[in-house]
Amino acid sequence: WEPDHELTDFIPDKRRRGYDMRKFCKLLLDPDSFFELQPKFAKNLVTGLGRLDGWSVGVIANNPMFQAGALNPDSCDKAIRLMCLCDAFNIPIIWLMDVPGFNVGRKVEHERMLFKAIRMVEALCNLSTPTISVVIRKGFGLAYQAMNTSGMGAWGFYSWPGAEIGFMDPDVGVNVAYSNKLEGLDKEGRETERQ
């Protein structure tokens, strides 16, 4: 068995560099089989249908090119729609995860972020169709759980080499834990201190 280098080389080595998950889906699935649903709505999440080795599958994937792939109320609704569609026709779902978390702030709170996140997790828990999840680069916080981890019922759970999984992004954790110490340092000192 030899890995597909076009697929493995597609993901950038630098963790902050974005990539287009739509292109990744087209590489992963059978040639010319990926059909994206709602491509102009909630661009931070890619949903679609395709074929993998001839089998029909649904795809739910974070898109790091938009809002770093973070989930917001619209992307939660988009994921729920695809889950309901695939569940109705017993189409397995592949989850491709590269999620830094949920968006936060006044705007998303007014858009009922918490309610939409809970609805997404509820829809996930009610799925009866087979699912597998792959952490491509990162999975942090509650958004990691909402993207179908093994604890949420995934039939298979895999991670890409170098994937990061945790409660929060390590850089954010350092800023939270050492904010007082970092305030007194200049920019060069901060980078040195983080390492």
Over which residues does each language-model region extend?
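Ligand-binding clefts of soluble mixed alpha/beta catalytic domains
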Residues: 1-195
